[in-house]
Amino acid sequence: MGDAPSPEEKLHLITRNLQEVLGEEKLKEILKERELKIYWGTATTGKPHVAYFVPMSKIADFLKAGCEVTILFADLHAYLDNMKAPWELLELRVSYYENVIKAMLESIGVPLEKLKFIKGTDYQLSKEYTLDVYRLSSVVTQHDSKKAGAEVVKQVEHPLLSGLLYPGLQALDEEYLKVDAQFGGIDQRKIFTFAEKYLPALGYSKRVHLMNPMVPGLTGSKMSSSEEESKIDLLDRKEDVKKKLKKAFCEPGNVENNGVLSFIKHVLFPLKSEFVILRDEKWGGNKTYTAYVDLEKDFAAEVVHPGDLKNSVEVALNKLLDPIREKFNTPALKKLASAAYPDPSKQKPMAKGPAKNSEPEEVIPSRLDIRVGKIITVEKHPDADSLYVEKIDVGEAEPRTVVSGLVQFVPKEELQDRLVVVLCNLKPQKMRGVESQGMLLCASIEGINRQVEPLDPPAGSAPGEHVFVKGYEKGQPDEELKPKKKVFEKLQADFKISEECIAQWKQTNFMTKLGSISCKSLKGGNIS
């Protein structure tokens, strides 16, 4: 057996890959004297998803550093947070969480015997704890409590009192679990600073707080247990993983708001220390990255294509999920999963009258606001060699700013004054500091010698003319496509260039009133 790690080595293990540490000097002092006592809590709400591998990998680090680690299944918190977990399902949810999190830890080689597991209601309903809740409520302002839970507790128009209690209970957990530190996501920061402010008011000591970064969901927003579209469930089938990754936002050259790339950075690299891009030999073969920054650089330069990135993530992710799927492929755990998360369609309605908005939204091409545009100016992005910044006339009072990754594929002079096809109702987002107000649609052939061509409107088209799929010309486009609903991504999965170089959705042509949308030469290509 090797020598025990030094205090400095323990500090490195405890803090690596974290986004922020509050109380680092106190942490150093504790490590000089004894082992650190730390807890990680999770509210037992929606099904845990693949981003939970981020805290799992840190728990592995804590154990390597000799820490005494407690995992709290915060069932009472799950109920207090706008009843994300109904009272009658709390026990079942705790059991589900315990089984799935233990399976995750085993999947990455963490020894369970070194961990302590505890349920919130095992001590949060005691006389002493309840009295401290009242004591805390006598010194905490409504403003501070609401502010503390703003990024964690579900925000609604008429918030319940229970949501205001949530941060105080999480603060008290630090005292009642007798720990030196609490570990959580950066979204917990306001609760952590709340605890640092108010625990001393009750005569309790201020704890150390360790925060990991949040992994963006597949839509680019925070990955959430309670939002199905944003995440991959730990028990998703392989075909579901493929489907969700295929629809994930992963624009060529765009490293911002890229859920797929962020998952590699925050989950796969910390667990495996390397990542392999899987490619056919004719496209250059496999390439192994041992540093995330190198992968990000190649993706930004469009050396790595989104299709190869997604396929490689799919393979790596399924290797992590296979042991978890196998564990849950038993009658007892299948029954537990069904009982803890009953099918909503089989539940009795809670209120009289028909449910509003019960019909699923149609995902049809008419929801896209696609227009003919004319490029007025085109310049290199000041901070990204692979990006252009274009001013495009789309028939509005002022031209729109659009950022596109075409530098390596289309000379600047070919874009100047060119008629193009622009998706106009995406949510604006910053790309390397410049806000893009649309997407210039292009055909592409993937591979090591990737080819890209902007789509061409029919000759004689004018800026602002409506582009539609034949048969869907009458519909009203969404004012703004909501990223969480992934309308564009779902439709894009069926975009294709025909053998006649016509842009199509499900083999039906994209058109204007003057004819079909086309590209110059990329038969059988994709559209993005």
Curated annotation (Swiss-Prot):
Gene3D superfamilies: HUPs (3.40.50.620), Nucleic acid-binding proteins (2.40.50.140), Tyrosyl-Transfer RNA Synthetase (1.10.240.10). Changing residue 308 to Y: Found in a patient with proximal-predominant motor neuropathy; likely pathogenic; loss of function. The modification N-acetylglycine is found at residue 2. Residues 364-468 form the tRNA-binding domain. One of its GO terms (cellular component) is nucleus. The modification N6-acetyllysine is found at residues 197, 206, 474, 482, 490. The nuclear localization signal, which mediates localization to the nucleus, is also important for interacting with tRNA(Tyr), suggesting that it is sterically blocked when tRNA(Tyr) is bound. It is linked to Charcot-Marie-Tooth disease, dominant intermediate C: A form of Charcot-Marie-Tooth disease, a disorder of the peripheral nervous system, characterized by progressive weakness and atrophy, initially of the peroneal muscles and later of the distal muscles of the arms. The dominant intermediate type C is characterized by clinical and pathologic features intermediate between demyelinating and axonal peripheral neuropathies, and motor median nerve conduction velocities ranging from 25 to 45 m/sec. This is Tyrosine--tRNA ligase, cytoplasmic. The lineage of its organism: Eukaryota, Metazoa, Chordata, Craniata, Vertebrata.
